[in-house]
Amino acid sequence: MILSVIIPCYNESKTILSLIEAVKKSPVKNREIIIVDDGSKDGTRDILNQLNDPEVRIIFHSKNKGKGAALRTGFSEAKG
């Protein structure tokens, strides 16, 4: 069984990397991390584009659609 961790984010340039690291420190090994950037305008997108981590999948919304939409996008892509 795989655990899917969905992280919706909007303008989280100051916190997104520490959030990812916190999830990766969990004892659960069979997991996937899905980040849905909901149209960030503060550099979050640039940070995520530079992230080279096979455990993290990133999905971008072209514009802000709200937290619920970001979660639904993540759920639709989740394997767990």
Predicted stretch roles:
Residues M1-G80:
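Structured catalytic core of nucleotide-sugar glycosyltransferases
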